[in-house]
Protein backbone atom coordinates (compact mmCIF):
# COMPACT_ATOMS: atom_id res chain seq x y z
CA UNK A 1 0.00 0.00 0.00
CA UNK A 2 2.70 2.51 1.01
CA UNK A 3 4.75 2.20 -2.23
CA UNK A 4 1.59 2.91 -4.26
CA UNK A 5 0.82 6.00 -2.19
CA UNK A 6 4.39 7.29 -2.53
CA UNK A 7 4.40 6.70 -6.31
CA UNK A 8 1.06 8.47 -6.73
CA UNK A 9 2.10 11.41 -4.53
CA UNK A 10 5.46 11.89 -6.27
CA UNK A 11 3.82 11.66 -9.70
CA UNK A 12 1.22 14.30 -8.85
CA UNK A 13 3.84 16.63 -7.38
CA UNK A 14 6.11 16.14 -10.41
CA UNK A 15 3.16 16.77 -12.74
CA UNK A 16 2.31 20.09 -11.10
CA UNK A 17 5.95 21.21 -10.90
CA UNK A 18 6.52 20.32 -14.56
CA UNK A 19 3.43 22.23 -15.70
CA UNK A 20 4.48 25.26 -13.64
CA UNK A 21 8.17 25.30 -14.61
CA UNK A 22 8.50 23.93 -18.14
CA UNK A 23 5.17 22.61 -19.47
CA UNK A 24 6.36 22.53 -23.09
CA UNK A 25 9.61 22.02 -24.96
CA UNK A 26 10.08 23.15 -28.53
CA UNK A 27 11.62 20.52 -30.80
CA UNK A 28 12.06 21.99 -34.26
CA UNK A 29 8.76 23.72 -35.02
CA UNK A 30 6.75 21.50 -32.70
CA UNK A 31 5.88 22.20 -29.06
CA UNK A 32 5.95 19.01 -27.00
CA UNK A 33 3.92 18.89 -23.77
CA UNK A 34 6.53 17.66 -21.30
CA UNK A 35 4.08 17.34 -18.41
CA UNK A 36 2.13 14.61 -20.24
CA UNK A 37 5.09 12.24 -19.92
CA UNK A 38 5.22 12.49 -16.11
CA UNK A 39 2.29 10.13 -15.36
CA UNK A 40 3.68 7.69 -17.91
CA UNK A 41 6.99 7.58 -16.02
CA UNK A 42 5.11 7.05 -12.76
CA UNK A 43 3.05 4.28 -14.36
CA UNK A 44 6.14 2.51 -15.72
CA UNK A 45 7.73 2.69 -12.26
CA UNK A 46 4.58 1.17 -10.72
CA UNK A 47 4.75 -1.68 -13.24
CA UNK A 48 8.48 -2.32 -12.77
CA UNK A 49 8.20 -2.38 -8.98
CA UNK A 50 5.24 -4.76 -9.04
CA UNK A 51 2.69 -2.34 -7.61
CA UNK A 52 0.38 -3.40 -10.44
CA UNK A 53 0.74 -6.20 -13.00
CA UNK A 54 0.75 -5.87 -16.77
CA UNK A 55 -2.17 -8.31 -16.90
CA UNK A 56 -4.24 -6.06 -14.63
CA UNK A 57 -3.45 -3.06 -16.83
CA UNK A 58 -4.37 -4.83 -20.08
CA UNK A 59 -7.60 -6.09 -18.53
CA UNK A 60 -8.45 -2.58 -17.31
CA UNK A 61 -7.75 -0.94 -20.67
CA UNK A 62 -9.88 -3.46 -22.56
CA UNK A 63 -12.90 -3.16 -20.30
CA UNK A 64 -16.27 -3.12 -22.03
CA UNK A 65 -17.53 -0.73 -19.34
CA UNK A 66 -18.20 2.91 -20.23
CA UNK A 67 -15.43 4.15 -17.93
CA UNK A 68 -12.65 2.42 -19.90
CA UNK A 69 -9.76 4.92 -20.13
CA UNK A 70 -9.44 4.27 -23.87
CA UNK A 71 -13.12 5.08 -24.48
CA UNK A 72 -12.89 8.23 -22.39
CA UNK A 73 -9.82 9.41 -24.33
CA UNK A 74 -11.57 8.85 -27.68
CA UNK A 75 -14.65 10.72 -26.47
CA UNK A 76 -12.70 13.68 -25.12
CA UNK A 77 -10.33 14.08 -28.08
CA UNK A 78 -13.05 13.74 -30.70
CA UNK A 79 -15.25 16.33 -28.95
CA UNK A 80 -12.21 18.60 -28.63
CA UNK A 81 -11.51 18.26 -32.36
CA UNK A 82 -15.03 19.46 -33.17
CA UNK A 83 -14.54 22.49 -30.91
CA UNK A 84 -10.99 23.30 -32.06
CA UNK A 85 -12.13 23.15 -35.68
CA UNK A 86 -14.72 25.84 -34.93
CA UNK A 87 -12.06 27.97 -33.32
CA UNK A 88 -9.81 27.58 -36.38
CA UNK A 89 -12.63 28.91 -38.58
CA UNK A 90 -12.80 32.03 -36.38
CA UNK A 91 -16.16 31.20 -34.81
CA UNK A 92 -15.26 31.92 -31.19
CA UNK A 93 -13.54 35.22 -31.98
CA UNK A 94 -16.51 36.23 -34.13
CA UNK A 95 -18.96 35.53 -31.29
CA UNK A 96 -16.74 37.39 -28.82
CA UNK A 97 -16.62 40.44 -31.11
CA UNK A 98 -20.41 40.40 -31.41
CA UNK A 99 -20.79 40.15 -27.64
CA UNK A 100 -18.48 43.12 -27.00
CA UNK A 101 -19.97 45.22 -29.81
CA UNK A 102 -23.45 45.19 -28.24
CA UNK A 103 -22.27 46.81 -24.99
CA UNK A 104 -21.78 50.41 -26.24
CA UNK A 105 -18.61 51.02 -24.25
CA UNK A 106 -19.97 49.99 -20.85
CA UNK A 107 -17.43 48.00 -18.85
CA UNK A 108 -20.24 46.44 -16.83
CA UNK A 109 -21.97 45.52 -20.07
CA UNK A 110 -18.78 43.97 -21.46
CA UNK A 111 -18.32 42.05 -18.21
CA UNK A 112 -21.84 40.58 -18.33
CA UNK A 113 -21.65 39.92 -22.06
CA UNK A 114 -18.35 38.03 -21.85
CA UNK A 115 -19.53 36.00 -18.85
CA UNK A 116 -22.72 34.97 -20.65
CA UNK A 117 -20.90 34.25 -23.91
CA UNK A 118 -18.24 32.14 -22.19
CA UNK A 119 -20.98 30.26 -20.32
CA UNK A 120 -23.02 29.49 -23.44
CA UNK A 121 -19.99 28.41 -25.47
CA UNK A 122 -18.80 26.20 -22.61
CA UNK A 123 -22.15 24.42 -22.60
CA UNK A 124 -21.94 23.61 -26.32
CA UNK A 125 -18.17 22.92 -26.39
CA UNK A 126 -16.01 22.43 -23.27
CA UNK A 127 -14.38 24.51 -20.56
CA UNK A 128 -10.77 24.05 -21.69
CA UNK A 129 -11.52 25.13 -25.26
CA UNK A 130 -13.26 28.31 -24.09
CA UNK A 131 -10.49 29.24 -21.64
CA UNK A 132 -7.69 28.69 -24.15
CA UNK A 133 -9.45 30.57 -26.98
CA UNK A 134 -11.19 33.39 -25.08
CA UNK A 135 -8.30 34.43 -22.83
CA UNK A 136 -6.01 35.73 -25.64
CA UNK A 137 -8.92 37.62 -27.23
CA UNK A 138 -9.81 39.35 -23.95
CA UNK A 139 -6.18 40.27 -23.29
CA UNK A 140 -5.85 41.86 -26.74
CA UNK A 141 -9.19 43.64 -26.48
CA UNK A 142 -8.40 45.14 -23.06
CA UNK A 143 -4.96 46.26 -24.22
CA UNK A 144 -6.49 48.13 -27.16
CA UNK A 145 -9.06 49.77 -24.89
CA UNK A 146 -6.51 50.51 -22.12
CA UNK A 147 -8.59 48.80 -19.43
CA UNK A 148 -7.69 46.30 -16.71
CA UNK A 149 -8.19 42.78 -18.14
CA UNK A 150 -8.27 40.95 -14.80
CA UNK A 151 -12.06 41.21 -14.15
CA UNK A 152 -12.80 39.88 -17.62
CA UNK A 153 -10.26 37.07 -17.85
CA UNK A 154 -11.00 35.76 -14.37
CA UNK A 155 -14.77 35.95 -14.87
CA UNK A 156 -14.64 34.00 -18.13
CA UNK A 157 -12.41 31.41 -16.44
CA UNK A 158 -14.97 31.05 -13.65
CA UNK A 159 -17.85 30.92 -16.14
CA UNK A 160 -16.14 28.19 -18.16
CA UNK A 161 -15.44 26.05 -15.09
CA UNK A 162 -18.93 26.54 -13.64
CA UNK A 163 -21.18 25.97 -16.63
CA UNK A 164 -19.03 23.00 -17.65
CA UNK A 165 -21.04 21.16 -14.99
CA UNK A 166 -24.22 21.16 -17.08
CA UNK A 167 -23.35 18.42 -19.60
CA UNK A 168 -21.28 15.29 -19.14
CA UNK A 169 -19.06 16.35 -22.07
CA UNK A 170 -18.28 19.77 -20.55
CA UNK A 171 -15.14 18.60 -18.75
CA UNK A 172 -13.09 15.39 -18.95
CA UNK A 173 -13.44 15.05 -15.18
CA UNK A 174 -17.22 14.84 -15.61
CA UNK A 175 -16.68 11.92 -17.96
CA UNK A 176 -14.23 10.08 -15.69
CA UNK A 177 -16.52 10.24 -12.67
CA UNK A 178 -19.94 9.89 -14.32
CA UNK A 179 -18.89 6.98 -16.52
CA UNK A 180 -17.64 5.11 -13.45
CA UNK A 181 -21.33 4.60 -12.58
CA UNK A 182 -22.49 4.17 -16.22
CA UNK A 183 -24.33 7.49 -16.30
CA UNK A 184 -25.66 8.53 -19.71
CA UNK A 185 -26.07 12.07 -21.08
CA UNK A 186 -29.71 12.64 -20.10
CA UNK A 187 -29.42 10.99 -16.68
CA UNK A 188 -26.45 13.22 -15.93
CA UNK A 189 -28.28 16.35 -17.09
CA UNK A 190 -31.40 15.50 -15.06
CA UNK A 191 -29.29 15.64 -11.90
CA UNK A 192 -26.83 18.42 -12.71
CA UNK A 193 -29.05 21.12 -14.23
CA UNK A 194 -30.12 22.55 -10.85
CA UNK A 195 -26.65 22.51 -9.21
CA UNK A 196 -25.28 24.18 -12.35
CA UNK A 197 -27.90 26.93 -12.30
CA UNK A 198 -27.33 27.52 -8.58
CA UNK A 199 -23.56 27.60 -9.12
CA UNK A 200 -23.86 29.86 -12.16
CA UNK A 201 -25.97 32.43 -10.33
CA UNK A 202 -23.78 32.31 -7.22
CA UNK A 203 -20.54 32.68 -9.19
CA UNK A 204 -21.89 35.61 -11.18
CA UNK A 205 -23.14 37.42 -8.05
CA UNK A 206 -19.78 36.91 -6.33
CA UNK A 207 -17.84 38.09 -9.38
CA UNK A 208 -19.94 41.25 -9.59
CA UNK A 209 -19.40 41.89 -5.87
CA UNK A 210 -15.63 41.44 -6.26
CA UNK A 211 -15.15 43.54 -9.41
CA UNK A 212 -18.00 46.10 -9.36
CA UNK A 213 -15.71 49.03 -8.49
CA UNK A 214 -13.47 48.22 -11.47
CA UNK A 215 -16.33 48.33 -13.97
CA UNK A 216 -17.72 51.83 -13.50
CA UNK A 217 -15.53 53.65 -16.01
CA UNK A 218 -16.85 54.05 -19.57
CA UNK A 219 -14.60 53.23 -22.50
CA UNK A 220 -14.59 54.30 -26.12
CA UNK A 221 -16.02 51.38 -28.13
CA UNK A 222 -13.89 50.01 -30.95
CA UNK A 223 -15.70 50.27 -34.26
CA UNK A 224 -13.82 47.61 -36.20
CA UNK A 225 -15.66 44.70 -37.77
CA UNK A 226 -14.79 41.02 -37.60
CA UNK A 227 -16.07 38.98 -40.51
CA UNK A 228 -16.05 35.22 -40.87
CA UNK A 229 -13.93 34.62 -43.94
CA UNK A 230 -15.45 31.27 -44.88
CA UNK A 231 -18.93 31.06 -43.42
CA UNK A 232 -19.76 27.77 -45.13
CA UNK A 233 -16.95 25.93 -43.33
CA UNK A 234 -17.95 27.50 -40.01
CA UNK A 235 -21.58 26.47 -40.45
CA UNK A 236 -20.56 22.93 -41.37
CA UNK A 237 -18.49 22.66 -38.18
CA UNK A 238 -21.28 24.12 -36.06
CA UNK A 239 -23.81 21.73 -37.58
CA UNK A 240 -21.62 18.70 -36.87
CA UNK A 241 -21.06 19.81 -33.26
CA UNK A 242 -24.79 20.37 -32.66
CA UNK A 243 -25.79 17.06 -34.27
CA UNK A 244 -23.09 15.26 -32.29
CA UNK A 245 -24.32 16.71 -28.99
CA UNK A 246 -27.96 15.87 -29.79
CA UNK A 247 -26.98 12.34 -30.86
CA UNK A 248 -25.10 11.77 -27.61
CA UNK A 249 -28.20 12.95 -25.72
CA UNK A 250 -30.46 10.33 -27.36
CA UNK A 251 -27.93 7.46 -27.19
CA UNK A 252 -29.75 5.54 -24.42
CA UNK A 253 -32.61 4.86 -26.85
CA UNK A 254 -30.25 3.19 -29.35
CA UNK A 255 -27.85 1.45 -26.94
CA UNK A 256 -24.80 3.14 -28.43
CA UNK A 257 -21.81 4.42 -26.47
CA UNK A 258 -20.82 8.08 -26.52
CA UNK A 259 -17.32 7.54 -27.83
CA UNK A 260 -18.63 5.82 -30.98
CA UNK A 261 -20.81 8.80 -31.86
CA UNK A 262 -18.26 11.51 -31.07
CA UNK A 263 -15.55 9.72 -33.06
CA UNK A 264 -17.91 9.26 -36.01
CA UNK A 265 -18.84 12.96 -36.14
CA UNK A 266 -15.22 14.10 -35.80
CA UNK A 267 -14.10 11.84 -38.66
CA UNK A 268 -17.15 12.73 -40.75
CA UNK A 269 -16.47 16.45 -40.29
CA UNK A 270 -12.88 16.14 -41.49
CA UNK A 271 -13.89 14.00 -44.48
CA UNK A 272 -16.58 16.53 -45.41
CA UNK A 273 -14.21 19.49 -45.14
CA UNK A 274 -11.48 17.72 -47.12
CA UNK A 275 -13.98 16.97 -49.90
CA UNK A 276 -15.26 20.57 -49.88
CA UNK A 277 -11.69 21.86 -50.11
CA UNK A 278 -10.87 19.40 -52.88
CA UNK A 279 -13.86 20.59 -54.92
CA UNK A 280 -12.50 24.13 -54.60
CA UNK A 281 -8.98 22.84 -55.32
CA UNK A 282 -7.73 24.08 -51.97
CA UNK A 283 -5.55 22.45 -49.34
CA UNK A 284 -7.42 21.28 -46.20
CA UNK A 285 -5.40 23.74 -44.09
CA UNK A 286 -8.07 24.11 -41.43
CA UNK A 287 -8.08 20.33 -40.87
CA UNK A 288 -4.30 20.22 -40.54
CA UNK A 289 -4.30 23.15 -38.09
CA UNK A 290 -7.06 21.52 -36.06
CA UNK A 291 -5.14 18.26 -35.81
CA UNK A 292 -1.98 20.14 -34.78
CA UNK A 293 -3.92 21.67 -31.85
CA UNK A 294 -5.68 18.47 -30.79
CA UNK A 295 -5.07 17.56 -27.14
CA UNK A 296 -3.18 14.36 -27.93
CA UNK A 297 -1.11 14.94 -24.79
CA UNK A 298 -4.18 13.64 -22.93
CA UNK A 299 -3.37 10.12 -24.14
CA UNK A 300 -0.18 9.52 -22.07
CA UNK A 301 -1.55 11.74 -19.29
CA UNK A 302 -4.79 9.79 -18.86
CA UNK A 303 -3.34 6.33 -19.48
CA UNK A 304 -0.49 6.98 -17.05
CA UNK A 305 -2.78 8.29 -14.32
CA UNK A 306 -5.20 5.41 -14.96
CA UNK A 307 -2.42 2.90 -14.21
CA UNK A 308 -1.45 4.77 -11.04
CA UNK A 309 -5.10 4.92 -9.94
CA UNK A 310 -5.39 1.19 -10.69
CA UNK A 311 -2.33 0.56 -8.51
CA UNK A 312 -3.93 2.46 -5.64
CA UNK A 313 -7.11 0.46 -6.10
CA UNK A 314 -5.38 -2.93 -6.30
CA UNK A 315 -3.35 -2.21 -3.15
CA UNK A 316 -6.36 -1.22 -1.07
CA UNK A 317 -5.60 2.51 -0.87
CA UNK A 318 -8.86 3.72 -2.41
CA UNK A 319 -10.90 1.38 -0.23
CA UNK A 320 -9.11 2.71 2.85
CA UNK A 321 -9.84 6.29 1.76
CA UNK A 322 -13.51 5.41 1.24
CA UNK A 323 -13.73 3.88 4.73
CA UNK A 324 -12.00 6.90 6.23
CA UNK A 325 -14.47 9.33 4.62
CA UNK A 326 -17.48 7.27 5.70
CA UNK A 327 -21.03 7.38 4.37
CA UNK A 328 -22.53 10.23 6.40
CA UNK A 329 -23.16 13.53 4.57
CA UNK A 330 -21.60 12.27 1.31
CA UNK A 331 -22.50 15.35 -0.73
CA UNK A 332 -20.78 17.74 1.67
CA UNK A 333 -17.77 15.51 2.38
CA UNK A 334 -17.01 14.51 -1.20
CA UNK A 335 -17.78 17.99 -2.52
CA UNK A 336 -15.32 19.68 -0.18
CA UNK A 337 -12.67 16.94 -0.34
CA UNK A 338 -12.73 16.78 -4.15
CA UNK A 339 -12.36 20.56 -4.37
CA UNK A 340 -9.37 20.54 -2.02
CA UNK A 341 -7.86 17.40 -3.56
CA UNK A 342 -8.06 18.92 -7.04
CA UNK A 343 -5.76 21.66 -5.80
CA UNK A 344 -3.33 19.18 -4.25
CA UNK A 345 -3.31 16.60 -7.06
CA UNK A 346 -4.81 18.52 -10.03
CA UNK A 347 -8.41 17.72 -11.03
CA UNK A 348 -7.68 14.98 -13.59
CA UNK A 349 -5.71 12.69 -11.23
CA UNK A 350 -8.18 13.55 -8.48
CA UNK A 351 -11.21 12.54 -10.54
CA UNK A 352 -9.64 9.22 -11.55
CA UNK A 353 -8.77 8.38 -7.95
CA UNK A 354 -12.18 9.51 -6.63
CA UNK A 355 -13.89 7.37 -9.28
CA UNK A 356 -12.27 4.35 -7.61
CA UNK A 357 -12.90 5.63 -4.08
CA UNK A 358 -16.64 6.04 -4.73
CA UNK A 359 -16.73 2.58 -6.31
CA UNK A 360 -17.00 1.06 -2.83
CA UNK A 361 -20.26 2.90 -2.17
CA UNK A 362 -23.77 2.05 -3.34
CA UNK A 363 -27.26 3.44 -3.74
CA UNK A 364 -28.08 7.02 -2.83
CA UNK A 365 -24.73 7.52 -1.08
CA UNK A 366 -22.88 6.58 -4.29
CA UNK A 367 -24.92 9.01 -6.40
CA UNK A 368 -24.31 11.91 -4.02
CA UNK A 369 -20.60 11.11 -3.71
CA UNK A 370 -20.04 10.90 -7.48
CA UNK A 371 -21.98 14.03 -8.40
CA UNK A 372 -20.52 16.11 -5.57
CA UNK A 373 -17.04 14.98 -6.68
CA UNK A 374 -17.88 16.18 -10.19
CA UNK A 375 -18.87 19.54 -8.73
CA UNK A 376 -15.60 19.74 -6.82
CA UNK A 377 -13.54 18.82 -9.88
CA UNK A 378 -14.99 21.78 -11.79
CA UNK A 379 -15.27 24.47 -9.12
CA UNK A 380 -11.92 23.46 -7.63
CA UNK A 381 -10.34 24.74 -10.85
CA UNK A 382 -10.73 28.33 -9.70
CA UNK A 383 -9.74 27.96 -6.07
CA UNK A 384 -6.06 28.06 -7.09
CA UNK A 385 -4.30 27.72 -10.48
CA UNK A 386 -3.23 24.20 -9.47
CA UNK A 387 -6.82 22.95 -9.58
CA UNK A 388 -6.78 22.21 -13.31
CA UNK A 389 -4.34 22.05 -16.20
CA UNK A 390 -6.41 24.80 -17.84
CA UNK A 391 -5.72 27.02 -14.82
CA UNK A 392 -1.98 26.64 -15.24
CA UNK A 393 -2.24 27.26 -18.98
CA UNK A 394 -4.50 30.25 -18.23
CA UNK A 395 -1.86 31.93 -16.06
CA UNK A 396 0.76 31.15 -18.70
CA UNK A 397 -1.32 32.87 -21.40
CA UNK A 398 -1.76 35.94 -19.20
CA UNK A 399 1.99 36.10 -18.62
CA UNK A 400 2.69 35.94 -22.36
CA UNK A 401 0.30 38.85 -22.92
CA UNK A 402 1.93 40.96 -20.23
CA UNK A 403 -0.99 40.73 -17.78
CA UNK A 404 0.15 40.85 -14.15
CA UNK A 405 -1.88 38.17 -12.41
CA UNK A 406 0.17 36.33 -9.82
CA UNK A 407 -0.56 33.03 -8.12
CA UNK A 408 -1.63 34.96 -5.02
CA UNK A 409 -3.95 37.18 -7.08
CA UNK A 410 -5.69 34.09 -8.43
CA UNK A 411 -6.07 32.70 -4.91
CA UNK A 412 -7.33 36.03 -3.57
CA UNK A 413 -10.28 35.98 -5.96
CA UNK A 414 -10.66 32.20 -5.99
CA UNK A 415 -11.02 31.92 -2.23
CA UNK A 416 -13.85 34.46 -2.37
CA UNK A 417 -15.79 33.05 -5.33
CA UNK A 418 -15.21 29.27 -5.14
CA UNK A 419 -16.52 28.48 -1.61
CA UNK A 420 -19.83 30.31 -2.16
CA UNK A 421 -20.27 28.72 -5.58
CA UNK A 422 -19.46 25.28 -4.18
CA UNK A 423 -22.01 25.71 -1.39
CA UNK A 424 -24.68 26.77 -3.90
CA UNK A 425 -23.95 23.83 -6.21
CA UNK A 426 -24.03 21.30 -3.37
CA UNK A 427 -27.31 22.80 -2.13
CA UNK A 428 -28.79 22.27 -5.59
CA UNK A 429 -27.50 18.69 -5.63
CA UNK A 430 -29.00 17.91 -2.22
CA UNK A 431 -32.38 19.25 -3.42
CA UNK A 432 -32.26 17.07 -6.56
CA UNK A 433 -31.06 13.92 -4.80
Language-model features, listed with the residues they occupy:
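Membrane-helix interface "capping/anchor" motifs
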Residues: 20-33, 143-151, 345-346
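Hydrophobic alpha-helical transmembrane segments
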Residues: 8-17, 55-58, 104, 133-149, ...
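Membrane-core helix-loop-helix motifs of multi-pass transport proteins
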Residues: 1, 140-232, 365-366, 393-427
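Helix-loop-helix module between adjacent transmembrane segments
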Residues: 79-87, 105-109, 117-127, 158-167, ...
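Hydrophobic transmembrane alpha-helices of multi-pass small-molecule transporters
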Residues: 1-84, 194-200, 204-314, 413-433
Amino acid sequence: MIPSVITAALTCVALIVTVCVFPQKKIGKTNISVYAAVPTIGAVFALITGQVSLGDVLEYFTLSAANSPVKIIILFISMSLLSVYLDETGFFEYIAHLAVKKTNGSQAGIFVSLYVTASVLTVVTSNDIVVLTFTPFICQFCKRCSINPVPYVFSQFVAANTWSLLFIIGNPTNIFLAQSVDTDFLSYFSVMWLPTVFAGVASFVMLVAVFKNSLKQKIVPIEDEYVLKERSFTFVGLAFLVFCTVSIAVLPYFELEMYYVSAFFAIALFVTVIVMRAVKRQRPTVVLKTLSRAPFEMIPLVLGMAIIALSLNKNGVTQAICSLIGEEDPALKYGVLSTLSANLLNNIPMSMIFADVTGYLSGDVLQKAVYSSIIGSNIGAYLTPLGALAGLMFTSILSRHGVKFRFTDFMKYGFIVAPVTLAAALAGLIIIL
